[in-house]
């Protein structure tokens, strides 16, 4: 249920755009016929260039009236006649008060999901997914960046906007609050009064350092007393609205989906039958944008697109209803695009999956996607992750896309885990500053409902009852993922210049802070960073 808003809003936004485009084309055609009947004394000018138009509509854009109902649609060929308006307020209320099949699932949790998962944005940026850098015209419109560029950040904003604060130096544990938290994490039994002093110095409505310190102090306090987290009382409405606020304010999920989808498009550019195996699917938000791009690619529409969805661990023990709802939404959207689409939910536990669990036809080009989910299988032994990667390798994929958070929390002792997470979350909390006021209720909700719970979980992961092989969900840095991918038999695929340029355009067009930057690193990683702290990394493998 929590992800229905994510998926349906985006799908409907794209569908509505396509419908409006069709209506505009029909209107233009009708006007042209009328002009032919009445002589025009003024000849039409002839331009030697083409204007960018509806061919590159935005897979992330959401209008003021989203919803996932296709009124008057008895068949996808009649999509252009759907003219009923969609009311965003009524739609949001229906999400909170109603729901899809996943809401009735008692195993579907409110918490435990990714803090950067995609949510519809009111901002708008053009989609360049359907323009693979193969032809000369595309390269003229968007020149590739210099190969030597390793770190890039958007140009300074226009003068009417206040300049952002200057970049800060590398993470400094000498910040009094952070140093006190780290010292307490090292030897809590010898510093019983430290936690009290920390609580007196932090605030959930202060500056980013005080706000991060507040949630770590709360987590350490709950760990010591073994009391339940107060954030667990947040409502489903808070959860939904928090994701929306985050995605409006920050580019995390947009960057991850855009970069991975571009790699998939380039790897399957001439393929007619495409099969995507998605490890850890929620509501399929990533695939709405890809379907749109495939429907308009220069080499023509694929003959068939199939997605095999392996449920995300956070969907609980009964993910079937949620997967069925996801498949139905994607099928309806594919019909709007006139695409031959199939969706297969894979309900076998991941530990029991093998090659026979998937229907793979000989003429298919297969793609495997791990998007912000593989770390949830990661424990200190990496056994389950290794099993999943070897399974993916056995399917002989054309490309494997991997997106992960950029912080080492797994194979480190508790004090270093706290130190690394302080660096990570201080950057995340700071990244909310440009677009969310400190006294904003929306910001407080995002930090409490999304990040506060994550901090609580990573602190509690060091409990004595966590036996080896039972502690999951702690993130790793890209170098460890490189080791795991290469151990499973994969080799890296360097992102194309076009993919990098496209990620830069995302930051440009959304007018994000200049403290966001892209960092390219060997052998083929591209990371989104805030103030020189990488937060999210996407890579491709084969």
Curated annotation (Swiss-Prot):
Compartments annotated for it: namely: Nucleus
User: Among its keywords, does the record have Lipid metabolism?
Assistant: no
- Region entry Leucine repeat I (LRI), spans: 171-224
Q: Where is this motif: VHIID?
A: 274-278
Residues annotated as region VHIID? 243-309
What processes in GO biological process is this protein linked to? regulation of DNA-templated transcription
Q: What Pfam families does this protein's entry cite? A: GRAS
Which UniProt keywords are present, listed alphabetically?
DNA-binding, Nucleus, Stress response, Transcription, Transcription regulation
Mutant lacking the gene: phenotype? Reduced germination ratio by salt treatment. Mannitol, an osmotic agent, together with salt strongly inhibit the growth and the plants are generally unhealthier than wild-type with less green cotyledons. Dramatic reduction of about 75% in root length upon salt or general osmotic stress. Plants wither under drought stress and the leaves have quicker water loss rate.
Molecular-function GO term, any one? DNA-binding transcription factor activity
- Keyword match DNA-binding: yes
Q: Where is the composition biased (Pro residues)?
A: 154-169
- Where along the chain is composition biased (Low complexity)? 18-30
Which InterPro entries does the entry link to? TF_GRAS (IPR005202)
> What ranges does the record give for the region Disordered, renumbered to this chain?
18-71, 133-174
Tissue specificity, in the record's words, reads: Expressed in leaves, sepals, filaments of stamen, and in the central cylinder of the elongation zone in root.
Q: What is known about what this protein does?
A: Probable transcription factor involved in plant development. Involved in environmental abiotic stress resistance. May increase the expression of stress-responsive genes. Binds DNA in vitro.
Subunit field text: Homodimer.
**Which protein family is it in?**
Belongs to the GRAS family.
What name has this protein been given in UniProt?
Answer: Scarecrow-like protein 7
What species is given as this protein's source? Arabidopsis thaliana (Mouse-ear cress)
Gene for this protein?
A: SCL7
């Amino acid at each position: 249920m929590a992800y229905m808003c994510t998926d349906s809003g985006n799908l409907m936004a794209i569908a509505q755009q396509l419908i409006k485009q069709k209506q505009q084309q029909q209107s233009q055609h009708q006007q042209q016929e009328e002009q032919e009947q009445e002589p025009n004394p003024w000849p039409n000018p002839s331009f030697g260039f083409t204007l960018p138009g509806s061919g590159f509509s935005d897979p992330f854009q959401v209008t003021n009236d989203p919803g996932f109902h296709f009124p008057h649609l008895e068949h996808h060929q009649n999509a252009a006649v759907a003219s009923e308006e969609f009311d965003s307020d009524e739609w949001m209320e229906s999400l909170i008060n109603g729901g899809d099949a996943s809401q009735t699932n008692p195993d579907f949790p409110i918490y435990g999901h990714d803090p950067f998962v995609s949510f519809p944005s009111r901002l708008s940026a053009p989609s360049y997914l359907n323009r693979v850098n193969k032809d000369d015209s595309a390269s003229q419109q968007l020149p590739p960046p210099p190969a030597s560029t390793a770190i890039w950040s958007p140009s300074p904003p226009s003068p009417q906007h206040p300049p952002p604060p200057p970049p800060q130096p590398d993470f400094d544990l000498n910040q009094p609050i952070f140093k006190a938290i780290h010292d307490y994490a090292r030897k809590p039994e010898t510093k019983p009064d430290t936690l009290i002093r920390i609580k007196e110095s932090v605030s959930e409505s202060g500056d980013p350092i005080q706000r991060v310190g507040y949630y770590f102090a709360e987590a350490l306090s709950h760990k010591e007393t073994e009391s339940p987290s107060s954030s667990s009382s947040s409502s489903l409405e808070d959860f939904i609205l928090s994701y929306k606020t985050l995605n409006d304010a920050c580019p995390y999920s947009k960057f991850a989906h855009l970069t991975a989808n571009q790699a998939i498009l380039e790897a399957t550019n001439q393929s007619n039958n495409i099969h995507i195996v998605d490890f850890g699917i929620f509501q399929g938000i990533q695939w709405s944008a890809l379907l749109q791009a495939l429907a308009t690619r220069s080499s023509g529409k694929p003959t068939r697109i199939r997605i095999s969805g392996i449920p995300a661990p956070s969907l609980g023990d009964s993910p079937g209803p949620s997967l069925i709802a996801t498949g139905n939404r994607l099928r309806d959207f594919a019909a709007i695009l006139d695409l031959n689409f199939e969706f297969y939910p894979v309900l076998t536990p991941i530990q029991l999956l093998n090659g026979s669990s998937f229907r793979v036809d000989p003429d298919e080009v297969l793609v495997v996607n791990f998007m912000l989910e593989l770390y949830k299988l990661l424990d200190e032994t990496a056994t389950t992750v290794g099993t999943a990667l070897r399974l993916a390798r056995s399917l002989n994929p054309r490309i494997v896309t991997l997106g992960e958070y950029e912080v080492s929390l797994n194979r480190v002792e508790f004090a270093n885990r706290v130190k690394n997470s302080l660096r990570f979350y201080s950057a995340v909390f700071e990244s909310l500053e440009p677009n969310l006021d400190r006294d904003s209720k929306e910001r407080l909700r995002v930090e409490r409902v999304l990040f506060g719970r994550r901090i609580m979980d990573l602190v509690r992961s060091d409990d004595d009852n966590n036996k080896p092989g039972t502690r999951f969900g702690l993130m790793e840095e890209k170098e460890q993922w490189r080791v795991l991918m290469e151990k499973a038999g994969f080799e890296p695929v360097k992102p194309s210049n076009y993919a990098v340029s496209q990620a830069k355009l995302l930051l440009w067009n959304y007018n994000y802070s200049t403290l966001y930057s892209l960092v390219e690193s060997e052998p083929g990683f591209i990371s989104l960073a805030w103030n020189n702290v990488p937060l999210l990394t996407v890579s491709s493998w084969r």
